[in-house]
């Protein structure tokens, strides 16, 4: 996330290292600041509070991949190529076991902590918007029609990621998303996303 100040980037990198090595319980503000070589007050300055830092951390797991999805699909005409690029990109996200392992460390806490839950829910809204942008759903009617697909796309990615993290030798993410692409074509055709217009 290049838009962050260098101090904020160091804090996020330190938080990621601590999360990877010690789980969510290792995300103590003093430990993060110490690992980043920064003051504890810098966390408040850059992120507001721990929930803000954890939200930025969760966003960092998929930020570059989502940006890449928007760029890759935006270069393609509306239609099959664009749909394939979207699902191919989502396949790569689902197969990123390291990022999802970190996300799964945070998720139970987001479900219990109201502030964190609200922030992670806002991230999910952004992920759905990413799918809608990739489908070129720019007007309100198209967004309304394609929002259920966006919700299911995110659910498929999360569900496949869980299976891939638990059993990477058996969970064939690519085969599952190939099937998903075939299953959604009739719906996307009806919605106008596969028209070459």
PLM feature spans:
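Short, basic, alpha-helical segments at the C-terminal edge of helix-turn-helix-like DNA-binding modules
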Residues: 59-66
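Hydrophobic alpha-helical connector segments
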Residues: 56, 70-100, 149-153
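Hydrophobic alpha-helical bundle segments that form small-molecule/ligand-binding pockets
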Residues: 74-78, 112-115, 125-150, 156, ...
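Helix-turn-helix
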Residues: 10, 14-52, 56
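Short helix-capping/turn signature of helix-turn-helix
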Residues: 47, 92, 105-112
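Amphipathic alpha-helical packing segments from all-alpha helical-bundle domains
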Residues: 66, 70-71, 96-104, 114-139, ...
């Amino acid at each position: 996330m290049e838009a962050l100040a260098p101090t904020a980037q160091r804090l996020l990198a330190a938080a990621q290292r601590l999360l990877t090595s010690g789980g969510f319980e290792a995300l103590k503000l003093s430990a993060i600041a110490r690992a980043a070589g920064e003051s504890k007050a810098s966390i408040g300055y850059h992120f507001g509070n721990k929930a803000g830092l954890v939200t930025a951390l969760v966003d960092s797991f998929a930020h570059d991949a989502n940006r890449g999805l928007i760029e890759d699909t935006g270069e393609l005409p509306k239609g099959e190529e664009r749909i394939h690029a979207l699902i191919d990109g989502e396949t790569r996200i689902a197969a990123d076991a390291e990022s999802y392992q970190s996300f799964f460390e945070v998720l139970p806490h987001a479900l219990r902590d109201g502030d964190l839950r609200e922030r992670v829910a806002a991230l999910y809204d952004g992920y759905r918007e990413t799918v809608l942008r990739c489908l070129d759903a720019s007007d309100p009617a198209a967004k309304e029609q394609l929002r259920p697909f966006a919700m299911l796309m995110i659910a498929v990615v999360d569900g496949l990621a869980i299976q891939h993290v638990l059993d990477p030798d058996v969970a064939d993410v690519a085969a599952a998303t190939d099937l998903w692409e075939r299953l959604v074509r009739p719906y996307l055709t009806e919605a106008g996303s596969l028209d070459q217009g």
